[in-house]
């Protein structure tokens, strides 16, 4: 996690603009309306691309093992792409996105194994996130939650971090489908579709 130390006295752990902006004396305003609109658009795009990819693959494809992640199949990677946004969204209710929250979600979703079930789950996640981001619920957006990714962050900041995280894993799935399964998807997300979503330069 990032750590900011101010005047050798104040320590701020995590990506926490609500504390960092006043502590550093920054004269900036956070545009929540613009932020939520952009996040909603990109989540609809990213989750939609994930759903389309799942729909084109056979059961054999979905259960192929990944060479870079022991004990994971392509199905597991796709469920990771979809479940982390759900966890980030749900943090506005449960108050965290912890490793235990992640393990509980894995247990809850362990029987979601077929493409239709995965697609139905993804569509539900997309709808919940879209409705939340369009709700103008500033109190929920600004709720500070402890998260495995980012430290102490607001729910809106967590959704932004997880958008990047899931998009990076979607790109890994695209690579696997192309290079290992030798399947050409008919309508993958383009670079333009994902423009503005920051992901690591290294794919793995």
Predicted regions span which residues?
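Short, contiguous alpha-helical
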Residues: 61-107, 144-204
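Short, proline-centered helix/strand-breaking motifs
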Residues: 1-2, 58-59, 200
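A general structural signal marking secondary-structure boundaries and capping sites
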Residues: 27, 54, 61, 96, ...
């Amino acid at each position: 996690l990032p750590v900011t130390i101010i005047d050798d006295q104040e320590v701020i752990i995590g990506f926490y603009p609500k504390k960092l902006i006043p502590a550093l004396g920054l004269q900036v305003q956070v545009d929540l309306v613009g932020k939520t609109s952009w996040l909603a658009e990109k989540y609809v795009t990213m989750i939609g691309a994930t759903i389309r990819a799942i729909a084109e693959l056979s059961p054999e494809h979905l259960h192929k093992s990944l060479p870079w992640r022991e004990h994971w199949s392509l199905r597991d990677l796709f469920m990771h792409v979809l479940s982390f946004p759900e966890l980030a969204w749900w943090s506005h209710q449960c108050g965290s996105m912890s490793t235990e929250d992640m393990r509980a979600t894995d247990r809850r979703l362990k029987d979601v194994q077929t493409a239709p079930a995965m697609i139905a789950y993804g569509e539900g996640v997309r709808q919940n996130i879209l409705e939340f981001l369009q709700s103008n619920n500033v109190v929920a957006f600004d709720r500070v939650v402890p998260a495995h990714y980012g430290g102490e962050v607001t729910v809106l900041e967590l959704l932004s971090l997880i958008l990047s995280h899931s998009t990076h894993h979607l790109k890994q799935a695209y690579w696997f489908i192309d290079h290992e399964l030798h399947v050409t998807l008919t309508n993958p997300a383009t670079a333009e579709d994902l423009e503005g979503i920051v992901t690591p330069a290294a794919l793995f």
